[in-house]
Amino acid sequence: MIILGIDPGYAILGYGAVEAERGKIRVIDYGVVETTPKMTFPERLERLYAGTKLLLERYRPDHVAFEELFFYRNTTTALQVAAAAQQAGLPLYEYTPMQIKQSVTGDGHADKLQMQTMVKLLLKLQKIPKPDDAADALGAALCHANALGPMVEQFRIK
């Protein structure tokens, strides 16, 4: 199963694509979609929407996972991601920041460095993914991979 983790942001949208199979998780790719301060609000939203669509086409994920909209500061960006996933017919799953931290580190109150270090270790990466947004997106993908099973549907956006 391919999972696309997303860390929605207005200036930078982080992404992390992983493959989860038989309890093993491997990184396919990670990175960011960026906007610039010179862009108008509609231009930024269009770039984020188009970037998300491109990621969905490139990695063809089975599921898309990201931080719960309610907790996210920029719900407009998160809604663009949700719209692109919905248009592609993909199930979208959301997790609270505490759930992601608990799943990845074992501590729902872990700090950013603890999260990044565990993402690096769990995914057997040479170094902590940069920028931070990409590491956060990989964290969302890891959280979803850990949640797969009969109970995963409770996290699905309906």
Name each region found by the language model:
Residues 1-158:
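Phosphate- and other anionic-substrate recognition elements at nucleic-acid/protein interfaces
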